């Protein structure tokens, strides 16, 4: 009887393990397909997440616009009722009421109160609609990526390489790919989620936010088409320079001042397996897994994404509005571009004025900087601008804006320093590549 009982118990364990392994495989495939696999529907090739986003924006645009106004109103009310440490923040919170009228004007074109360029109005509208659709959708599906073993599998295969190159754990690869295949806000959400759950260190979160929040594939395609440059050369050069630049910047200020500790203490441990990586990583997940209800996890992520949107939209609208005034002021742009003009002159680049103005505008917003760029410049200058646009990783309307909603300790000065160092490195490496190419072709 004892033998029969043990045999039954053993069979039960095997069946339970089979179902756990099946869950890891099925949920991981769902996550990969939703976030990372391009699918062609209606002659458009994009990820399933982007297809759903597109359908929502086309079929329910009016509802999304109404939701935006509700979100921004809630955000403004919360901001004005909050206790602010400084009078400046208090004044800004009252000024944020103006953002409601700006959005209504953009959506319904009924008021002449908004003095925005048509281009910037269009960019702002598309940014807001993408934010309120793509971010909640990605938040809903995020548990398939984070909670059911895919992170452990990726870490097992990529940990050694990522640690040597960038001082990152192997699981960071998934977060970086999230930026590339979706958009920066989805990437920021995932970075902060990993940090809050105690799965990446403070330093790793800062590295990803400052050095790997690169432009998505769709934005990169847009840049290549707008600048009329060869996409293959453009992407290969960009990835090569990205690896070189990040290998250096992941070991310099402000990254080297960040802690190696986790946000919270958990049982999670990084692991690297020399053999049987797939089997060992799945076993590791099964042994350390928490009892997670996927539907509760989806709802929790969705709620968090809505709270983020409510905080982001009023600030995004005001920053775009004020930024429009600044970038149209020739004197301000002239004063700011001097720093970059000096570096470009030393390296003897062509089209110095155009590139330096782009670098100033790019710190505000990539798409606006590309739209304002004079396109009658040399091919090398266009290629350089495109590479910078993909790799610079910092702008006021993206990660600096999003920082207010995260637990990641990076201040605005560190963002600015990181941006300047990054631009200088990209320019130096680009100069060396151009110089070596010119010698080779002689």
Name the predicted role of every residue range:
Residues 156-183, 259-296, 342-351:
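Juxtamembrane inter-helical linkers in multi-pass membrane proteins
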Residues 26-31, 200-224, 243-245, 366-442:
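C-terminal transmembrane helix pair
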Residues 1-28, 256-305:
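Intrinsically disordered, low-complexity non-transmembrane regions of multi-pass membrane transporters
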Residues 145-213, 371-380:
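Hydrophobic transmembrane alpha-helices that form the pore/transport pathway of multi-pass ion
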Residues 287-377:
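Transmembrane helical segments that form the transport core of multi-pass membrane transport proteins
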Residues 25-39, 64-79, 96-109, 135-143, ...:
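Hydrophobic core segments of alpha-helical transmembrane domains in multi-pass membrane transport
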Residues 134-147, 164-187, 319, 341-373:
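Hydrophobic alpha-helical transmembrane segments of multi-pass integral membrane proteins
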Residues 77-85, 104-119, 148:
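Transmembrane alpha-helix boundary signature
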């Amino acid at each position: 009887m004892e033998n029969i009982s043990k045999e039954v118990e053993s069979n039960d364990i095997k069946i339970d393990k089979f179902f756990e392994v099946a869950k890891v495989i099925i949920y991981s495939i769902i996550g990969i397909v939703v976030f990372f696999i391009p699918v062609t529907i209606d002659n458009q090739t994009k990820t399933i997440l982007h297809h759903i986003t597109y359908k929502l924006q086309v079929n329910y645009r009016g509802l999304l616009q109404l939701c935006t106004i509700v979100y921004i109103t809630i955000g403004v009310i919360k901001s004005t009722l909050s206790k602010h440490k400084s009078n400046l923040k208090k004044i800004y919170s009252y000024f944020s009421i103006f953002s409601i009228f700006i959005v209504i004007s953009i959506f319904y074109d009924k008021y002449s109160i908004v003095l925005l360029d048509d281009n910037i109005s269009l960019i702002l509208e598309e940014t807001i609609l993408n934010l309120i659709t793509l971010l909640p959708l990605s938040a809903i599906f995020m548990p398939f990526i984070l909670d059911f073993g895919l992170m452990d599998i990726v870490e097992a295969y990529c940990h050694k390489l990522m640690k040597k190159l960038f001082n990152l754990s192997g699981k960071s690869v998934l977060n970086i790919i999230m930026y590339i295949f979706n958009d920066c806000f989805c990437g920021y959400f995932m970075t902060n989620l990993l940090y809050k759950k105690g799965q990446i260190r403070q330093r790793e979160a800062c590295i990803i936010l400052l050095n790997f929040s690169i432009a998505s594939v769709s934005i990169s395609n847009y840049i290549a088409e707008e600048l009329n440059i060869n996409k293959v050369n453009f992407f290969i050069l960009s990835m090569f320079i990205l690896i070189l630049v990040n290998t250096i910047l992941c070991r310099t200020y402000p990254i080297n001042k960040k802690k190696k500790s986790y946000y919270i203490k958990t049982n999670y441990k990084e692991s690297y397996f020399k053999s049987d990586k797939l089997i060992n990583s799945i076993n590791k997940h099964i042994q350390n897994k928490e009892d997670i209800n996927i539907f509760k996890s989806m709802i929790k992520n969705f709620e968090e994404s809505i709270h983020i949107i409510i905080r982001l939209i009023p600030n995004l609208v005001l920053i775009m509005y004020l930024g429009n005034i600044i970038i149209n002021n020739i004197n301000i742009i002239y004063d700011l571009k001097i720093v970059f003009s000096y570096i470009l002159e030393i390296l003897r680049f062509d089209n110095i004025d155009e590139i330096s103005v782009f670098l100033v505008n790019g710190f505000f917003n990539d798409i606006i900087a590309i739209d304002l760029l004079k396109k009658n410049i040399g091919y090398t200058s266009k290629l350089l601008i495109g590479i910078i646009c993909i790799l610079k990783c910092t702008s006021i309307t993206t990660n600096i804006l999003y920082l207010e909603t995260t637990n990641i300790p990076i201040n605005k000065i560190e963002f600015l320093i990181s941006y300047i160092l990054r631009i200088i490195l990209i320019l130096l490496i680009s100069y060396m590549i151009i110089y070596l190419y010119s010698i080779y072709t002689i």
